[in-house]
C-alpha cells in the first residue's frame, strides 16, 4: 500500500475510534452440540421480490445456512445467500451470469458486537436501499455472514465471542463458499468482502490474512470446511484496526472540543443491537487525559516516516502541528466540499 493511502486510513481511524468507547450489555445464548452438514443444499430456498424507490429485484433466498459443522452459536454462525432469479432462467444481469458473478460478502459487524446475517432492504435511513439490495440489482450474488461478537456468552456464562471469534467465523463463511463453489451460483474466486468500522477492520483482516495458518486451530475447532479463506477484494469503510494507537490519534484530532455526542451501542432483550446518541461535557479528568494522549501522538506518527504522493516526509512537532496536519486537513476539506457540491 502506498504511504498516502496509509494516511487516509489513519485519518479514518481517528474519526471512527469513538465507537469503541460505547457502553454495552451482554447477551446470553445457548451452546449447541448438534453437528451440521457444510454441503450446500440447493433445494432450500424462497423466491422473493422487493421494490425500493421504484427499483424491483427478484431473487432466490437461501437463508440461515449454518456454515460450520460444530457451531458455538447458531444465532450468529449462519449465512444468508441471495441470487438474482434471472440466473436460474439462463439470463445475465449487468454482464454477469450464474457462473461468473462476483460474490458480495458484507458483514454486519459494528463495535465488535455480534451480528446476524443481513438481508436486502432499506438502509438505516429507512428510505434508500441497503448495500445488499444494490448489489443484487447490479447482478452480484450476495453472501451475508453472521459472526459472534465481544458480548456473546453461552448458557454457562462463558464468553464465546471474544477475539479471534469474529474473524474466525468470517473466515469459516468464506471457506464454505470456496468449498461449495462448484454447486453454488457465483464465483468464489471473486469474493468482495465489505464492512464498516469494526466490520471494516474485520474485512481488512480477511483480505490481509487469507489462508494464514495461524487460524487453522480455531477453524478446525468449529468444523470449518477444508478450503481456502481468501477473498479477492476488500471494501472497508473507516476500518478501526490500529487499536493500540487510535486513542492518541483521536485526541490529536479532536483535542479542545469538550462537548461531545457519542454513539452508545447496547443489546436489547431480544438480542437486537440498538444504537443511540448520548450528549454531554468532558470532565476535568477526561480533558487531562485528552491532553496527555494528544501529546503522545507526534512521536508515534513521526516514527512511521510516512510520505505523501510526492515523496515528502510527513511529520508533526511537539505541539501536534506540521505538514501531516495540513495533509489530513486537505482530505477533510476536500471531502466536505464534495458533500456540499452534491
Residue ranges and their predicted role:
Residues 179-256:
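Primarily recognizes the serine-hydrolase "nucleophile elbow" in alpha/beta-hydrolase
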Residues 106-168, 207-209:
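Cap/lid segment of the alpha/beta-hydrolase catalytic domain
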Residues 10-18:
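Bacterial N-terminal signal peptides
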Residues 79, 93-112, 116:
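Short beta-strand element of the alpha/beta-hydrolase
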Residues 24-97:
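Catalytic-loop region of hydrolases
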Residues 159-183:
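Alpha/beta-hydrolase active-site loop
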Residues 237-239, 245-342:
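Non-catalytic, alpha-helical, charged scaffold/linker segments
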Residues 1-9:
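Bacterial N-terminal signal peptides that target proteins for export
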